[in-house]
Amino acid sequence: MTLNLCVLTPNRIVWDSEVKEIILSTNSGQIGVLPNHAPIATAVDIGILRIRFNDQWLTMALMGGFARIGNNEITILVNDAEKSSDIDPQEAQQTLEIAEANLRKAESKRQTIEANLALRRARTRVEVINAIS
C-alpha cells in the first residue's frame, strides 16, 4: 500500500508521486506518516522532509507551510522546497556562513529575528545535503 504525496510551492510542483512513508517536520515536532494514517491538518515547520520512495530514503528542505493528510493522500503546501539533489553544497555552506555572520551583526530585535530565520533556512539546506539516505 502506498501514499500519494504532492509537495507544492506557489510557483511549482516539487513532488507528485506515490511513496511508502514520509517523516515530516511540523511545528510540534516530527511525525511519521504511513498508509491509512488518521486524517490531520498541520503546520509545517522549516525542516527536512524524508521520503521513502522505491525502498530508498530521499530528503527535501521545506521552508514552512501547511500539510493535509487523509485517505492515503498527503498534500504539502510550502513557501519553498528543494530536493537534496538540487542543492549546491558549496552555495549552501556559504549561505550558512553568511547567515551566521548576519546574526552576529544584528543590532535590533527585528534584525535578530530575520537573521535567526535565515539561519534556520540555511541550516536546513545544509542538513538536507548531509542527511543519511
UniProtKB/Swiss-Prot annotation:
CDD domains found in the cross-reference section: F1-ATPase_delta
Transmembrane segments annotated in the record for this chain: none
Main location: plastid
Top-level taxon: Eukaryota
Gene3D superfamilies named in the record: 6.10.140.480, F0F1 ATP synthase delta/epsilon subunit, N-terminal
Topological type in the membrane: Peripheral membrane protein
GO molecular function annotations of the record: ATP binding; proton-transporting ATP synthase activity, rotational mechanism
Cellular-component GO terms for this entry: chloroplast thylakoid membrane; proton-transporting ATP synthase complex
Compartments where located: Plastid, Chloroplast thylakoid membrane
Matches recorded under InterPro entries: ATP_synth_F1_dsu/esu (IPR001469), ATP_synth_F1_dsu/esu_N (IPR020546), ATP_synth_F1_esu_C (IPR020547), ATPsynth_dsu/esu_N (IPR036771)
Subunit relationships: F-type ATPases have 2 components, CF(1) - the catalytic core - and CF(0) - the membrane proton channel. CF(1) has five subunits: alpha(3), beta(3), gamma(1), delta(1), epsilon(1). CF(0) has three main subunits: a, b and c.
NCBIfam families: ATP_synt_epsi
Function recorded in the entry: Produces ATP from ADP in the presence of a proton gradient across the membrane.
UniProt similarity note: Belongs to the ATPase epsilon chain family.
Protein name per its UniProtKB record: ATP synthase epsilon chain, chloroplastic
Organism of origin: Citrus sinensis
